[in-house]
């Protein structure tokens, strides 16, 4: 069973800029990558990774795990409808792996990978979320 918990990040201005930049860069990279997948008619995650991983990292400066997440997200979108190259909104949700580029540091801090390194951001959660927080694992989307 999937469990969804919503938390409110409380970044300062510098952290907010870093978080905004990774969201925008991720979505820009995903839109570019979708065009590559469409042009090569590549609907295979491993095939697309072989085709574009190094250029994706060099062109957009994404951390390694973020580039892999970008490839996976593009494949999910492209496989739904192969008749066009999907385009992501600049502020669309970005998936983060709780093992690689996101980690909770105590009851009220989260460490998040950005383009310039990690930022440690305070967050708030409600009673419902706090009661179920120990069960959370897997993937996180930043909206």
Residue ranges and their predicted role:
Residues 1-143:
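Nucleic-acid substrate recognition interfaces
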